[in-house]
Amino acid sequence: MLGKDLLGLYDASVEDIMLILDTAVGMKKLLTQNLKKLPHLQGRTVTTLFYENSTRTRCSFELAAKYLGAGTVNISASSSSVQKGETLIDTGYTLDAMKNDVIVIRHPMGGAPHLLAKHVKASVVNGGDGMNEHPTQALLDFYTMREKFGSFKGLKVAILGDIKHSRVAKSNLFGLTKLGAEVVMYSPATLMPQGVERMGAKVARSREEALAGANVVMGLRIQLERMHGGLFPSLSEYAKYYGVGEEHLKYADKDCIVMHPGPVNRGVELTSDVIDADNSKITEQVLNGVAVRMALLFLLVKNRQGGEKNE
């Protein structure tokens, strides 16, 4: 049973993951029918508390909450009392006193959502914490895969890019291995974290090996903002040896799909012809993200304290 919070997929059960995905199916049907003002969370409040920049995640959560009838509050660290020295815990106490029902937090420090969840009555959702996890991105990725293939059993998911700094890669790895998929990772050695094989991933020795027979090809952004020092010679060198172009997809399964959590560096992780091809699901991922986050917000509020408000 889904608990009070969603802090990561490392300790999430298969049952919880499938519950969210199953609920999201109905939410997407409502979205595609243009039913964007539902009463499910009427009278509830969802706050996004972001200490890092975001377009997709923040907007997706805000729309998900509004489509379900909830009120929304957006807080950026740059324009809040954080600039005056307020701690995360004190910010949490303040938001709790205002009777928020759900707090979606993005923070540069790994573990920040877990810390916040220990000090507030509101449900806490991890919208990305440092290089740790990004569970809702992985959930929308799973939804996109299942929508195409129907099941995860036997799927080969190739993840190429900046694995070391990617919270998306970690959440995908944690969830996909539980769901029965094979995860293969490929990146420069300087961008491959230690221990991923112990977590269930296979590390490919070449781009061709990573892509061979892959059902899903997922590119990851080079996170220059998290890098200190030269981890590879140049973006052009990276694109030449690690990027994915149309000519490389001949190694993948003929019915493969291409995914990317965004934002995409065109011509670096993926070429434009790959991004814009018919088998690219990058735009569909964005729509699926709204449906998945609608499902998550609905389930968290429903399950917490029997559906009672934070009063």
Show which residues each predicted segment covers:
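Positively charged, low-complexity intrinsically disordered leader regions
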Residues: 1-59, 63
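Phosphate/diphosphate ligand-binding glycine-rich loop within oxidoreductases
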Residues: 35, 39-143, 266
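Phosphate-coordination loops involved in phosphoryl transfer and adenosine-cofactor binding
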Residues: 41-46, 153-157, 255
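Glycine-rich phosphate/diphosphate-binding loop of Rossmann-like nucleotide-binding domains
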Residues: 51-63, 147-220
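Short, structured coil segments at secondary-structure junctions
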Residues: 68, 119-121, 179, 197-200, ...
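Rossmann-like adenosine-cofactor binding region
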Residues: 196-273
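Adenosine-phosphate binding glycine-rich loop
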Residues: 255-256, 261-311
